A protein has these predicted regions:
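N-terminal accessory scaffold of Fe(II)-dependent oxygenases
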Residues: 1-167
Length: 167
């Protein structure tokens, strides 16, 4: 059965706690919230150039879409490289290389001061903030989050295509 990619996800510019809970969280309907962090310092300063300037020499694990590994879960990256080289690579040309479950806050703890967690949901898990960084052509394989979490996927630069499906 083919996946129908034509269903649009509702987009709002802002939303209250009550609106989010009643219209999206409780019925488990995805929503794009355009301005949730628009006033944050993170939105103003986080960019590939910013992270390269601060983390250029950091060795990072890099995942790809090796066809021999597509049928199994990968918890350890098959490649490593300097973060600065990775940023250069994804800005230069399309690539399937990506950083997955990269805890940038471990290396730059003060980044948590650049944003506030949204007040539209209860019990936001603040101890596991991860960055998913990839350039044009990178793909996160079909997966279910291991903790069955509801997540806030926040895009700071670039574009992302996301396919959601109900279990």
């Amino acid at each position: 059965m083919a996946i129908d990619y034509s269903k649009e996800i509702e987009t709002v510019n802002s939303i209250t706690y009550e609106e989010f809970q009643e219209n999206f969280y409780k019925p488990q309907i995805p929503v794009k919230i355009k301005n949730l962090l628009s006033d944050s310092r993170a939105n103003a300063k986080w960019s590939p150039k910013f992270f390269k300037r601060h983390l250029s020499d950091l060795e990072v694990g890099v995942f790809d879409n090796n066809p021999e590994l597509l049928d199994r879960s990968q918890k350890t990256a098959p490649h490593t490289m300097r973060f600065g080289d990775y940023i250069d690579m994804i800005e230069e040309k399309p690539t399937d290389a990506r950083l997955h479950l990269f805890n940038v806050f471990k290396h730059m703890p003060d980044l948590v001061k650049d944003f506030e967690y949204p007040d539209i949901a209860d019990r936001i898990l603040k101890s596991l903030p991860f960055a998913f960084i990839g350039g044009e052509g990178s793909v996160a394989r079909l997966h279910r989050d291991m903790d069955n979490s509801n997540v806030f996927l926040t895009e700071f630069w670039g574009r992302k295509k996301v396919v959601l499906f109900s279990p």
